[in-house]
Amino acid sequence: MYRWRGNPASTAYARDVPATPARDSYHHGALREELITASLKLIEAEGIGAVSLRRVAREAGVNPGAPYHHFADRSALLAAITVRGSALLEQSLREARQHAPTAAAALGALIEAYVRFAAENPAYIHLMLRPELSHPENHPEVQAAGEGAITLLTEVVQDCQREGSAPPGDPATLTGLVWALAIGIVTLWLDGPLEARCVDLGTTPGELTARITALLTGLLAGQPPRGERGG
């Protein structure tokens, strides 16, 4: 359903694991991971509403009471998945930043990495965009885990300002702008309109994201769009 430059593959969780393995096939330590994997597959196939501890236990092929050894309730399960997704996203963003030659390139790379992560791991992103489902008042680790990506983006924005490839001022405002752009692209992609629009434009979501990112970084650096440059 989701395509990134033609041929992505999920790297965060297995999608081809049989839904109902034998009930005696899990050791205690492995069960938690299988419950998370089963939940991710349910979210991608049927949406977040399909996830309950009883349903996840059935998908994992274990006793209905088994999930309670690891998760007190549904929100605890969703919180654990959200924390996992936030950590994986932050790792992807750090890798993207590491290979960028300039701060401006790093900013563009972070936007593309975020959108690519969402395309390859939609179940994680659906949860991360709905933090209230994890009841953050009971699971403060959800908000703490999400701060890593924001902190990283803010650092890159500040690097751009020092480099002269972004306007001076409060970095939090510019960070919010970039974050909103990335989430907007992701939301349009996961909900469907972006792919349809790309078909009309004769491009792909990945290519369109790269073009939008290049336009944004150019504007921040004070460069007009190509069609408006003099000479």
Regions found by a protein language model. Give the residues of each.
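Helical hydrophobic small-molecule/effector-binding pocket
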Residues: G108-R130, T151-T154, W179-L190
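N-terminal intrinsically disordered/low-complexity leader segments
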Residues: M1-A30, K41, A100, P193, ...
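Hydrophobic alpha-helical connector segments
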Residues: A80, R94-Y124, G146, P171-V178, ...
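Hydrophobic/aromatic-rich alpha-helical bundle segments in the mid-to-C-terminal region
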Residues: E137-Q143, E147, Q161-I212, R226-G231
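Short helix-capping/turn signature of helix-turn-helix
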Residues: F71, R130-S134
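Hydrophobic/aromatic residues within well-ordered alpha-helical segments
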Residues: R74, I81, G85, L89, ...
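Helix-turn-helix
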Residues: E34, A38, L42-A76, A80
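Generic hydrophobic, amphipathic alpha-helix propensity
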Residues: L31-S39, V56, I81-G85, L89, ...
